Amino acid sequence: FDFTSDKKVKEGFIKVTSETLFNDEQGYGYDLQPAWDGKSNQPFFFSVNVPDGNYKVTVTLGSKDSAGNTTVRAESRRLFIENLPTKKGEMITESFTVNKRNMKISEREKVKIKAREKNKLNWDDKLTLEFNGDAPRITSLAIERADKVPTIFLCGNSTVVDYDNEPWAAWGQMFPRWFTDQVAIANYAESGESANTFIGKHQIGRA
């Protein structure tokens, strides 16, 4: 995906404008909040419909027109890039691997989630990226399957869970920040969970 204002688009990329809004038919676009206009310092979300699995995400952050400071999270606020500064005209490319899942285990079985989990980004059919920070700036985004990387599974309670809303946070959603794109972190933790409830809700089966 090409987020620049350049008229020429690199081969293999899709041009993104402020009118590129997510819908299921298109399968990608700005989501959840107003679209980014390329200049605003407001946070924004970009979603892509992809099957379950691990995905290598490569972002080029920065802008030819202004300095930036960008934080990148995925799904339910899993932290991957924290406060990355870029000077005017500077571009920095970073890669990380995101685990994407939904509730489906098989044709006859799915994970049992609590009512409060139903709207969590962790359990929908999209891979959603959040661009935040003092001045989020992005030039390009590439997403590709990463089937061969190992996956670290996290199970736990409210001290580990991916919290959707600030200012709440737990160590599990900060964990990906410390790993390269050669490993995926799949956080299945949820508030109030124990070993017995993980088995009863089929969380272990989904993992």
Outline where the language-model segments fall.
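Compositionally biased, intrinsically disordered or flexible polar/acidic segments
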Residues: 1-166
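Conserved SGNH/GDSL esterase-like catalytic core that processes O-acyl groups on lipids
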Residues: 133-136, 144-206
